[in-house]
Amino acid sequence: MSVPAFDPKEMELKDVPGFMGMTTKSLSYPLNKHDHMTTTFKMEPWWQAFQATDATIFTPRIIPDNVARGFVFEAGRFDANTEGGGKDMFGVEWEYIKTVGGSMVRPGDPFLDDISEWREKLVWPDVDSWDWEGSAAKNNGTFLKPENFNQIWFQTGFYERLISLMDFEGAILALADEDSQEDVTAFFEKLTDLYINIFEHVIKYFPNVNAVFFHDDWGSQKETFFSPALAEKMIVPHMRKLTDFLHANGIFCELHSCGNNYKQVHNYIAAGWDAWAPQLMNDCYKIWDDFGDKILIATYPMNMPEEVMSKMTDNEKGAAFAALPEEEQRRIAREYVDRVCKPGKPSFYSFYAAHFLTPAFREEMYKESRLVYGGTK
C-alpha cells in the first residue's frame, strides 16, 4: 500500500471516545488504530506510531498468570489490590506488592531445587478447562473491537518461567551448566508446546487479537544476564518455534525484554520477533542504526537538552521538557523524526519515553513523520 501525501486537514482536532466513556480530542488520523498499527508492524507506517499505547492491552482473567501477576485488562472490573496474586498456571504462588503495583515469587523456597525435577514435580495446566467461551462472550466486540489493534500480553516467557520455578540463581545456573542443559532444553520444548496450545485457543476464541506482547527479561541496568551464545543455544530455537506458529496464523510478535540488551538484538531477530522496545538505558539510535531494517525498534528522542536529562525522575524530566519554549519542543520532535523515521526502515515511539509527549511534541512528530512517510519531504 502506497502512503498518501500529508493533508493539512489531518491536524484538525475532533472528539473521539475516551477512557470510561468520556470523550477526548484527537487529530483527524487517516487510518484507525488497527489499520495503522498493522502497517507499522509491516514496516510501512503512515506516521510515527506509539508503542504499546496505540494498541489495546488484553490480559484476560482466564489465564491464571494474569491474575497472579495482578495484571488483568479485559471487559469487567479487576482490582489488583484485592484480587492480584495467587497461583500461576503451574501452581507457583505469587505475592502482589501493593506499593509497587506488581507481583513476585517470594525468593528462598523455589518450586524446583534442580531442573531435573521438572518431570516429577510439575503439574501441567489443562488449558481446555479454562473458560474460553465465557471470556469470548464477555470480550469480543466490546473490549476487543475490530477497529483497534488488540495485543494480548503474555506475562512469563522462557527464562522468566525458569526464574519463577527456580529463583534467579537457580535459573541462571541451570541455563549455563552443561550438565543441566539437556533438562532445560526438554523443559523448554514442552513449555513451547504449552504456549502454542494457549495461543491456539486465543486465535480460536478471540479473532480480533492482532498481536502478542511476550515478556522475557534478559538483562539488568548494565549488562545482559547471559551471553548471546548461550541465549542462541538455549532459548532462541524455542522462541522461533513459537513465533513461526504465530506468524503462520497472522499474528504479529513483539518482545518485551528489559535490560541493557544491545548484544542480544541479533538473537531477538533470529527468534522471529517483529518488534522490541529497549529500555532507556540503551542507546536506541545505535540499535536502530544497526538493526532497524530487520526489527521494529521503539525509539525515543536522544537529542534532549542537558537541563532536561539532568533531572532525576521521569516525571521531573517530563516537566522540564514541558517548560521549554514550544518551538524548541517542536524542533526536538522534528530532529527526532528526521533521525529515526525512514521509509523502509521505520521505528515507533517508545512507551518508556511517554513523559516527553507534550501536545506540541506530539503534533510536530505526527506532522513531520507524515511528511516523511508520505514522500513529501
Task: Enumerate the predicted regions with their spans.
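Short, acidic Gly/Pro/Ser/Thr-rich loop/turn segments
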Residues: F58, W94, G101-G102, F158-E160
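A contiguous, low-structure linker/loop signature
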Residues: T82-V127, E133, P146-W153
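Active-site loop segments of alpha/beta catalytic cores
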Residues: M1-A52, K87, K121-K377
